[in-house]
């Protein structure tokens, strides 16, 4: 996976759409792209409220010849709980909170503890996602302990 990375806090979350705009303007330059989905990766989320890194990215076959600002991110093979979302993209943070506060305790599952630099949560935007309406094919992938 490769893409643009920036750090966010609760106060700066509203800047994420600007990162997506930059990403969309550059993704056509990535010749090693695999598939049609776009991804939002939430990385190094801390319970202490220090924010998290967010990567707007795509799957790639290799990390060569990427735009200068882009970084590579390793996505480990592991078990994921996958949640489909049919609402507007702006409600994803509410869905993520419901997963953490309701689904996890009720399911008896535990979130995996990713290594530094690996995602705590993955947003997957499929072919049917329409960035103009903010709706369509959206999934949230939560790494969980097997």
Q: Where do the model's predicted regions map?
A:
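A solvent-exposed interaction/effector surface
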Residues: 1-146
């Amino acid at each position: 996976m490769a893409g643009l990375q920036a750090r966010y806090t609760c106060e700066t979350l509203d800047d994420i759409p600007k990162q997506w705009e930059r990403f969309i303007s550059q993704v056509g330059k990535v010749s090693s792209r695999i598939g049609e989905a776009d991804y939002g990766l939430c990385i190094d989320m801390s319970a202490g409220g220090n924010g998290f890194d967010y990567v707007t990215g795509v799957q790639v076959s290799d990390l060569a010849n990427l735009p200068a600002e882009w970084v590579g991110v390793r996505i480990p093979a592991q078990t994921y709980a996958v949640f489909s979302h049919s609402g507007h993209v702006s409600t994803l943070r509410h869905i993520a909170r419901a997963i953490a506060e309701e689904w996890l305790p009720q399911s008896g599952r535990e979130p995996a503890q990713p290594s530094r630099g690996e995602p705590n949560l993955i947003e997957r935007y499929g072919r049917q996602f329409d960035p103009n309406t903010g709706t369509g094919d959206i999934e949230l992938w939560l790494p969980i302990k097997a």
